[in-house]
């Protein structure tokens, strides 16, 4: 869709907005519309359902906020024909719903609405006031939400799906008056994690309503769109072109780059870029919640204690991930957004919880330590900078000696184009990296808990890597596990199935990455944790000693049993030998009987005498087994 600057003036908007809304837009210093706003507002303010796919930072939030406020305003303040005053909204009813996949995005959407509503005139004709209510998980409970809903009677609900479904299941909440529903980041809301709740909510709403779906990657939602109950929707796609004239899903103000780098150097390269580049605020994306927690703790500590050799004291880090409470996440986001100390550089370390829809002013740089497992998230991450036609840079780090450079071509198929850049030079032969690694090892040795968190982060990264959609590019077999472990600050490689990919000649002895550490004396800084560790260590020592004692007793018992068995076997052998001797004597006596005519009684007597003589002979020879003619004839038996 091509537009010129004149056609984007608010005066040329093809819909007659409420007077107060026109004045509010003028007061907020929005001189012109963006293409997505110029296309969407007239359709959604009228009687059209819309599916809007537009690049990040293109003004999508205002593109649906204005139609929502227009519809609510008309419903509250316009007098129907034949009536003396507007029809009041019944108790328990709402007029509009806006759904978002994350609490942070929902909060930011509410801030946009409230910013416009602050300019609603303080006049009797604008009563009741237009109000919004935020419904997100872990921020209060459903009972508190209901109390607020009944007391304030908001017309616009801004919510995440789970909490909204719980809220709408209450009997007192009515949906029959609803006029419009918006799904922001609709592709995420319609994927497996939210789809069931979202479809249930939509089925609870009136069929005669307007529906708007908004996202930078709406095509990822696929056929699920048809389950949203839209009526003949208009699909709007607002895209840009790069300097080669190719369609680009990223805004032209956003410079997308990638660098090939040794895994071990990723963290220090990131720090060098943050230290040396000029920017106000930056966002650095990490793979997992645990890795954000690990690197945030590490860098916050090292920044405070860093000397001139690796001066990173001007960097101020913030942490944002899904394991934080809602209150902590919103507070962090607020502090990062409002930070304005000119002597500091503000860096938000985050997972993909900060990838969608969040609009933070003055974010000039985005760095991705690793690409996201879902390629559709890549553009959402990058889109936190270069918003509203401001210049921004987004850089993704790819591992050397792997197939990861193929990711660039993979993203080009999705109309996302990147240029290659070189890592910043370390002029003194990796001196920054080496100094940082020494400080990192010292940091790890100070507290056993830090190393445990590092190991957990490392294992989490390997699992994260194994789940990449582009598995032919991101292969576990090609990773440099030792280099990655050093980047995470590990003292020793953990035992895990993926270790089989490490070549035998490269595998360090017992997995130690540097000097061997005595794990019995490797202590926790936390006194209670250390006390518990020492108690467990003592228990383990006693248990080992007890086990050793039992093994020794069992060995003796086994030996005694073995000796008895041998004696029993010897006794049986002697009996067998005596039996053979007896049989031999009997045969000899029978032979003599035949030759000499001895009778049976004499044979028996002679046999007994022969045995007695043989025994006497054995005794006279010291029990040596006898040496006579008769005995000699038995020796080979």
From Swiss-Prot:
Instruction: Give the compositionally biased regions (Gly residues).
Output: 621-630
GO BP terms: namely: assembly of large subunit precursor of preribosome; maturation of LSU-rRNA
Per UniProt, the short sequence motif DEAD box occupies residue numbers 184-187
Query: Which PROSITE patterns does this chain map to?
Result: DEAD_ATP_HELICASE, HELICASE_ATP_BIND_1, HELICASE_CTER, Q_MOTIF
User: What EC number(s) is this enzyme filed under?
Assistant: 3.6.4.13
Family matches, as Pfam families: CTE_SPB4, CTT_SPB4, DEAD, Helicase_C
Residues covered by the Helicase ATP-binding domain: 41-236
Q: Where in the cell is it found?
A: Nucleus, Nucleolus
Q: Which InterPro entries match?
A: CTT_SPB4, DEAD/DEAH_box_helicase_dom, Helicase_ATP-bd, Helicase_C-like, P-loop_NTPase, RNA-helicase_DEAD-box_CS, RNA_helicase_DEAD_Q_motif, SPB4-like_CTE
Question: PANTHER family per the record?
Answer: RNA HELICASE
Q: What's the name of the protein?
A: ATP-dependent rRNA helicase SPB4
Which source organism does the UniProt entry give?
Lodderomyces elongisporus (strain ATCC 11503 / CBS 2605 / JCM 1781 / NBRC 1676 / NRRL YB-4239)
Its taxonomic placement starts with: Eukaryota, Fungi, Dikarya, Ascomycota, Saccharomycotina
């Amino acid at each position: 869709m091509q537009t010129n600057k004149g056609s984007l003036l608010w005066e040329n908007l093809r819909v007659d907005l409420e007077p107060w809304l026109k004045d509010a837009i003028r007061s907020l210093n929005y001189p012109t519309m963006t293409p997505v706003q110029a296309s969407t507002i007239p359709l959604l303010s009228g009687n059209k359902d819309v599916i809007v796919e537009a690049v990040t930072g293109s003004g999508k939030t205002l593109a649906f906020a204005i139609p929502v406020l227009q519809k609510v305003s008309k419903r509250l303040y316009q007098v129907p024909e034949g009536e003396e005053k507007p029809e009041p909204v019944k108790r328990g009813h709402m007029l509009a719903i806006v759904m978002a996949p994350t609490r942070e995005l929902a909060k930011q959407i509410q801030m946009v609405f409230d910013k416009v509503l602050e300019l609603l005139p303080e006049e009797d004709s604008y009563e009741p006031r237009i109000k919004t209510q935020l419904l997100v998980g872990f921020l209060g409970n459903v009972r508190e939400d209901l109390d607020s809903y009944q007391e304030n009677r908001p017309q616009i609900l801004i919510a995440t799906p789970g909490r909204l479904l719980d809220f709408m299941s209450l009997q007192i909440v009515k949906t029959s008056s609803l006029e419009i529903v918006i799904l922001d980041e609709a592709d995420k809301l319609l994927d497996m994690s939210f789809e069931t709740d979202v479809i249930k909510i939509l089925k609870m709403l009136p069929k005669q309503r307007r529906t708007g779906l908004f996202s930078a990657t709406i095509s990822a939602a696929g056929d699920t769109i048809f389950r949203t109950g839209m009526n003949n929707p208009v699909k709007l796609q607002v895209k840009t072109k790069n300097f080669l004239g190719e369609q680009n899903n990223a805004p032209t103000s956003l410079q997308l780059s990638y660098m090939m780098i040794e895994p071990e150097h990723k963290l220090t390269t990131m720090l060098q870029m943050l230290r040396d580049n000029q920017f106000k605020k930056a966002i650095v994306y990490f793979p997992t919640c645990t890795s954000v927690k690990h690197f945030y703790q590490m860098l916050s500590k090292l920044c405070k204690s860093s000397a001139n050799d690796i001066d990173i004291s001007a960097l101020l880090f913030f942490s944002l991930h899904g394991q934080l409470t809602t209150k902590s996440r919103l507070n962090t986001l607020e502090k990062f957004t409002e930070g304005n100390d000119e002597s500091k550089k503000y860096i938000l370390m985050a997972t993909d919880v900060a990838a969608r829809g969040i609009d933070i002013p003055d974010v000039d740089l985005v760095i991705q330590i690793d690409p996201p497992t879902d390629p559709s998230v890549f553009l959402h991450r990058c889109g936190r900078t270069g918003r509203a036609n401001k210049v921004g840079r987004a850089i993704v780090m790819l591992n050397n000696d792997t197939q990861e450079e193929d990711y660039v071509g993979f993203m080009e198929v999705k109309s996302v184009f990147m240029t290659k850049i070189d890592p910043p030079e370390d002029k003194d032969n990796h001196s920054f990296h080496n100094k940082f690694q020494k400080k990192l090892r010292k940091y790890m040795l100070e507290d056993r808990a830090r190393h445990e968190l590092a190991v957990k982060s490392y294992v989490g990264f390997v699992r994260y890597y194994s789940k990449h959609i582009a598995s032919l590019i991101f292969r576990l077999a090609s990773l440099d596990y030792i280099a990655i472990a050093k980047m995470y600050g590990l003292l020793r490689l953990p035992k895990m199935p993926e270790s089989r990919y490490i070549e035998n000649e490269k595998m360090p002895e017992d997995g130690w990455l540097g000097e061997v550490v005595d794990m019995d004396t490797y202590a926790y800084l936390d006194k209670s944790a250390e006390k518990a560790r020492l108690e467990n260590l003592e228990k383990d020592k006693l248990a080992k000693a007890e086990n050793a004692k039992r093994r020794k007793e069992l060995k003796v018992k086994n030996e005694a049993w073995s000796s008895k068995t041998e004696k029993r076997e010897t006794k049986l052998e002697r009996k067998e030998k005596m039996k053979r001797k007896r049989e031999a004597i009997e045969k000899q006596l029978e032979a003599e009987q035949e030759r000499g005519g001895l009778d049976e009684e004499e044979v028996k007597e002679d046999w007994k005498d022969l045995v007695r003589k043989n025994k006497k002979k054995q005794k006279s020879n010291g029990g040596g087994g006898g040496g006579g003619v008769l005995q000699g004839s038995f020796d080979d038996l």
